[in-house]
């Protein structure tokens, strides 16, 4: 889980660096605002994942039915959000005005989401196996 978060942060760092000068047209301004919003959501997501990991650690020490249900529900919500983001990324990747750097960022974000979803599903299965 820590590796995924570190990878996600590294991807975020790559996304923020661009060698091109800023153009001042509406599409680039929209892209800039979109990237700012994505960065905010990634930070919130990272904090949520840290909190979820703390909950799982606490659950392993003292398992309760309520905690198990809450953790599984949170994981299902995160997985659903990743699925929703995947659709947005697919639509953005179809744009013809993307440069190679933007395409790379979108592909990395999509791959990161796929990895995160896979790991969350594994963790969810592990949590479900713990007897209460």
UniProtKB/Swiss-Prot annotation:
Gene Ontology process terms (BP): protein complex oligomerization
Listed InterPro entries: Mite_allergen_group-5/21, Mite_allergen_group-5/21_sf
Biotech relevance: Non-allergenic peptides identified from the mapped major conformational IgE epitope-containing areas could be used for the engineering of house dust mite allergy vaccine.
Pfam families documented for this protein: Blo-t-5 (PF11642)
Chain positions covered by the region annotation Immunodominant conformational IgE-binding epitope: 25-53, 102-132
GO molecular function terms noted in the UniProt entry: protein homodimerization activity
Keyword Repeat: no
Alphabetical keyword list: Allergen
Domain of life of the organism encoding this protein: Eukaryota
Record-stated family: Belongs to the mite group 5 allergen family.
Assembly and binders: Monomer. Trimer of homodimers. Oligomerizes in a concentration-dependent manner.
Name of protein: Mite allergen Der p 5
Organism placement in taxonomy: Eukaryota, Metazoa, Ecdysozoa, Arthropoda, Chelicerata
Gene: DERP5
